[in-house]
């Protein structure tokens, strides 16, 4: 709801992938922010490359007028693959598509290479390299969120729709112009908040 969309492509030599397991990488959603930050440095030491793609909320709003979120993520992954110095042989991808394999087809529209694409649901849970990429993306996004909090002088939580603090912040601050550039306006939850009847707002809003 608030902040950028961040994805990460991580590459690792096959004989070093087990090192990621040893340091404790797992689905980033299962780790605390402190643990993710602790693992960040270790992951950068083990991985060959980390390509991080950030799409601001403002850019996302423009793109979502023309494309679905899945399409935008496919574009970003296609760009990330094109930016790797040493193209990977196999790429495991946590698919956001309801039909997991369909996401691979989307990516191929934006990057044509010799690597094998494997799109699966819960790939960031099943493959250490996906877990590592997920952790890097989360830490990078959290850093941006912290900067936004400082600018707006408010702790609005994680910026996700599952966070009550984020929902409350938007309800109370939707009218503030300086907040608008950070809002993902095309998100369904944001649309619901925008469509509230005037009578639902407090007098001081």
Placement of each model-derived feature along the sequence:
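RNase H-like, Mg2+-dependent phosphodiesterase core
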Residues: 1-205
């Amino acid at each position: 709801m608030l902040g950028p969309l961040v994805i990460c492509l991580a590459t690792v030599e096959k004989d070093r992938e087990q090192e990621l397991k040893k340091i404790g990488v797992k689905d980033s959603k299962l780790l605390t922010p402190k643990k993710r930050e602790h693992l960040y440095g270790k992951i950068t030491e083990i991985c060959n490359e980390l390509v991080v793609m950030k799409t601001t909320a403002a850019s996302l709003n423009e793109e979502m007028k023309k494309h679905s979120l899945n399409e935008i993520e496919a574009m970003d992954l296609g760009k990330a693959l094109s930016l790797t110095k040493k193209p990977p042989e196999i790429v495991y991808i946590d698919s956001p598509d309801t039909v997991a394999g369909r996401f691979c087809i989307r990516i191929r529209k934006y990057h044509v290479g010799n690597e094998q694409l494997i799109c699966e649901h819960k790939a960031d849970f099943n493959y250490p390299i996906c877990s590592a990429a997920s952790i890097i993306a989360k830490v990078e996004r959290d850093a941006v969120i912290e900067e936004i909090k400082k600018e707006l002088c408010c702790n609005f939580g994680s910026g996700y729709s599952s966070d009550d603090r984020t929902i409350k912040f938007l309800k109370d601050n939707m009218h503030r112009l300086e907040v608008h550039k950070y809002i993902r306006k095309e998100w369904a939850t944001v649309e619901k908040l925008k469509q509230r009847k005037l009578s639902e707002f407090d007098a001081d809003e």
